[in-house]
């Protein structure tokens, strides 16, 4: 039996779990974002290059078929993963990766934003043991879900998905091209020769962003150590609420204050800084208007002083706010969402 034949049941099981997750959670996107992501999912599944024009009729037919298929599997449980005669829990990434080591593959199964399960199986491009975590970088992806987050910290592992990062960048480019606004994304794209050599530019952007993504995920690991297990328990109390979005944004800001902002300032690469601000979510910007103002100051003057002054202050702010949020949860974990929203809203960093 060839390795491809041996691993086909695993590939099918991982992709099935991806489909089940999509069936349950794809509807959480706005219509515009959903359609954009589905077009790029079609591109990946059918093997089209980024610059290829997609056949709209085929995309439409595929979309209808996929949504009908989702209806048939939405209530299925996630499948166990078969590897070398054994079966593994799809969320036990450590055990699955130990079994996959001899095949040169990497797997991840975990929960992302809004408790959405994410799974992927890909070619292991790089594995590195650091002092406080293991870095696993995947190349080609053989199974993935609609969202395909480009990075995730799970336990003592940081997974970076190079192909998903490239696709995320491409989605951002396509989205920006609709309006061509003079914003952080537009400034980041101007650094690269996108119009004349899109593939080379995309590779260069991916190399640039991998360092930034790793900085954030390292910050996530450190933030998790500081916040402890009660943070995830608190998050589990407020699923699908504004409070959940705020809890995630506060942790993101804490992680970035620990590693991302200091690392970006030390690297002094304009493209990396622009990409970072282009990737900030609406809630992150709402909670940290001082950071947006510092970025605007840097853009106008070329002097990063405002960001440099803000970085150490932000760590103290988000650490203290996170502590107060945990106190609320520990004092009374019931009816938590409204109290968290009120606390965080009153603690914006302006």
Residue ranges of predicted features:
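Long, well-structured alpha-helical subdomains associated
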Residues: 55-58, 64, 260-350
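Post-HEXXH active-site segment of zinc metalloproteases
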Residues: 221-252
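Short, charged/polar micro-motifs that form catalytic or ligand-binding hotspots
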Residues: 86, 200-212, 241-249
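Active-site scaffold of zinc-dependent metalloenzymes
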Residues: 129, 139-207
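Active-site recognition of the HExxH zinc-binding catalytic motif
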Residues: 208-225
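N-terminal low-structure segments adjacent to metalloprotease catalytic domains
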Residues: 1-125, 197, 350
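Basic, amphipathic N-terminal segments that precede the first structured/catalytic domain
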Residues: 97-147, 155-156, 164-169, 173, ...
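An active-site-proximal "capping" alpha-helix that borders the catalytic cofactor pocket
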Residues: 248-264
